[in-house]
């Protein structure tokens, strides 16, 4: 992913947070993956291996795209809360974010 698209994705995620279309935190995100509400999931690239494995396994099982693109500091900056895991629950935001990530 190029730097321009990375910044656009970060801005879009911040907008989704302000629009109330994000679920944050490991347990809530995993619950939304299970309930098939989460459309795309992000886990901090500096999260613990256990956290990464748990989120990725759940995402894989329920066929929810999961990305490890941002650090915890970047996630905190984007959403305004110190979190390592979050998911987008809106189809529109999820689709556009995935397009930006995949170039």
Swiss-Prot record:
The keyword RNA-binding applies. One of its GO terms (molecular function) is RNA binding. The keyword RNA-binding applies. Keywords: RNA-binding. Pfam families: Ribosomal_L7Ae. RNA-binding protein that recognizes the K-turn motif present in ribosomal RNA, but also in box C/D and box C'/D' sRNAs. This is RNA-binding protein YlxQ. It comes from Enterococcus faecium. The lineage of its organism: Bacteria, Bacillati, Bacillota, Bacilli, Lactobacillales.
């Amino acid at each position: 992913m190029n730097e321009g698209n990375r910044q656009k994705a970060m801005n879009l995620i911040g907008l989704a947070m302000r629009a109330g279309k994000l679920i944050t935190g490991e347990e809530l995100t995993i619950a939304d993956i299970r309930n098939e509400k989460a459309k795309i999931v992000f886990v901090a690239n500096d999260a613990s291996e256990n956290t990464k494995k748990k989120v990725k396994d759940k995402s894989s099982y329920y066929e929810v795209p999961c990305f490890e693109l941002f650090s915890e500091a970047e996630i905190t900056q984007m959403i305004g809360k110190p979190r390592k895991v979050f998911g987008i629950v809106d189809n529109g935001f999820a689709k556009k974010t995935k397009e930006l990530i995949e170039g």
